[in-house]
Amino acid sequence: MSTPTGSRRIFSGVQPTSDSLHLGNALGAVAQWVGLQDDHDAFFCVVDLHAITIPQDPEALRRRTLITAAQYLALGIDPGRATIFVQSQVPAHTQLAWVLGCFTGFGQASRMTQFKDKSARQGSEATTVGLFTYPVLQAADVLAYDTELVPVGEDQRQHLELARDVAQRFNSRFPGTLVVPDVLIPKMTAKIYDLQDPTSKMSKSAGTDAGLINLLDDPALSAKKIRSAVTDSERDIRYDPDVKPGVSNLLNIQSAVTGTDIDVLVDGYAGHGYGDLKKDTAEAVVEFVNPIQARVDELTADPAELEAVLAAGAQRAHDVASKTVQRVYDRLGFLL
């Protein structure tokens, strides 16, 4: 694998909690990764350890881990330019997480918004210690690789702040041990919203699947969802996310998958109605997902190539992260 000279290291990952990424993942996080891999030392991970904070069927988890990695490759992540691996195959993540947990205040961990929200929904009996310590494992994910930059959305910014705090706390006792990562604000990518609730981000946590465009769904189903997308009672097609969120979301989607500027799209719809917009957007999405689905099918039908990519990625990840763990263990006084 070639790494650009003088490039800064980045780390990011996605949980394998479903059989398909959705369009928001593809045009948001993964599109950012594709753009970053050329001029960064990039580590992209399938974070399966994080997935087990809720019960998982073992066979489903194995399948979803492989299919998530396959979608990384199909969307343009290049193992010749980035390290792609599965979290559980690199022991350094859990080794470092225990140490960092011993440098994380209970009060700070208790204030993590995602934990408070999820534990409130699940109730105390159903809430696991794993969910509570989830941000500490995230910190280990990042700090194990001497990561300099982390591309994060607003929902993960608090967790990155915890990682920074823990690294600084460790360094205050053992100077120069851990690299303190910075937030990376990538170039603007498309923000894709739920088709049925276009004021909310497209997300697997939505109450219904009707607003999601899953990359690996039957294209006919995706087209049907787009034709049923919420719009408004007006007739004119213009880009105005505040007043016309549904129409603006469809324009965003079509623009993102075709590379056509939104203003050009709007001009082309002069005198046309929402039916035309939905039809064209559906056709554009189907054209976008078809080659992705074909590549995923190819990789999963004969997984030798995919498994080789993940094995090579895990080895490189281990080579890097184990040095961090060894450095941390040495500073703490552990026998090596």
From Swiss-Prot:
L-tryptophan binds at D141. It is found in: Cytoplasm. Its main location: cytoplasm. One of its GO terms (cellular component) is plasma membrane. Transmembrane segments: none annotated. It is an enzyme of class 6 (ligase). InterPro entries: aa-tRNA-synth_I_CS (IPR001412), aa-tRNA-synth_Ic (IPR002305), Rossmann-like_a/b/a_fold (IPR014729), Trp-tRNA-ligase (IPR002306), Trp-tRNA-ligase_bac-type (IPR024109), Trp-tRNA_synthetase (IPR050203). SUPFAM superfamilies: Nucleotidylyl transferase. The keyword Protein biosynthesis applies. Keywords: Aminoacyl-tRNA synthetase, ATP-binding, Cytoplasm, Ligase, Nucleotide-binding, Protein biosynthesis. A motif ('KMSKS' region) lies at residues 201-205. ATP binds at Q15, P16, T17, G24, N25, G153, E154, D155, I192, K201, M202, S203, K204, S205. A motif ('HIGH' region) lies at residues 16-25. One of its GO terms (molecular function) is ATP binding. It holds the Pfam family tRNA-synt_1b. Its EC number is 6.1.1.2. It catalyses: tRNA(Trp) + L-tryptophan + ATP = L-tryptophyl-tRNA(Trp) + AMP + diphosphate + H(+). GO terms for biological process: tryptophanyl-tRNA aminoacylation. Homodimer. Catalyzes the attachment of tryptophan to tRNA(Trp). Belongs to the class-I aminoacyl-tRNA synthetase family. This is Tryptophan--tRNA ligase. It comes from Mycobacterium tuberculosis (strain ATCC 25618 / H37Rv). The lineage of its organism: Bacteria, Bacillati, Actinomycetota, Actinomycetes, Mycobacteriales. The gene is trpS.
